[in-house]
């Protein structure tokens, strides 16, 4: 299970790095694009390794694998803060965001995503749901960020 846990974490970290490495002026134009490509990649990976990924998501309590979503949330929170600093640098500072609300929203996003795997949605449906999730979460974050 370790290799599957690590793949998901590393793929997500890579997407965060790709976005952070973009020129700051370009980041608002593509906000969400890289991370949602990453979500599709993680979805396909999880479906290719369904049993192992479901074990991580559903049966890993008490093991080192139980923190997958929490670790991803921490990475996303850090990325969100970095993006807020970029927006401020560009003269488009976002309004303050309550840290508890931020944590709840990000945690909810990952739980929503991984529900597709847990419930073994047919892959074409899951792909469509990820597209819908992208529209929903991107619009919400744009509103919260005052963009």
Spans of model-derived segments:
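Alpha-helical structural segments
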Residues: 1-21, 37-41, 67, 71-74, ...
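C-terminal/domain-terminus segments
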Residues: 56-73, 125-141
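Hydrophobic/aromatic-rich alpha-helical bundle segments in the mid-to-C-terminal region
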Residues: 83-136, 145
């Amino acid at each position: 299970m370790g290799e599957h846990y690590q793949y998901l974490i590393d793929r997500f970290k890579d997407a965060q790095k790709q976005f952070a490495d973009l020129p700051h002026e370009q980041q608002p134009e593509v906000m969400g694009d890289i991370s949602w490509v990453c979500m599709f990649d993680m979805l396909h990976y999880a479906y290719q390794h369904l049993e192992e990924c479901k074990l991580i998501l559903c049966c890993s309590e008490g093991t080192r694998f139980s923190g997958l979503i929490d670790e991803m949330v921490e990475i996303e929170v850090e990325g969100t803060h970095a993006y807020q600093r970029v927006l401020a640098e560009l003269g488009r500072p976002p309004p303050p965001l309550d840290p508890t609300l931020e944590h709840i929203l990000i945690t909810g996003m990952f739980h929503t995503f991984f529900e597709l795997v847990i419930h073994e949605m047919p892959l074409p449906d899951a792909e469509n749901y990820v597209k819908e999730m992208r529209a929903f979460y991107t619009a919400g974050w744009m509103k919260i960020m005052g963009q």
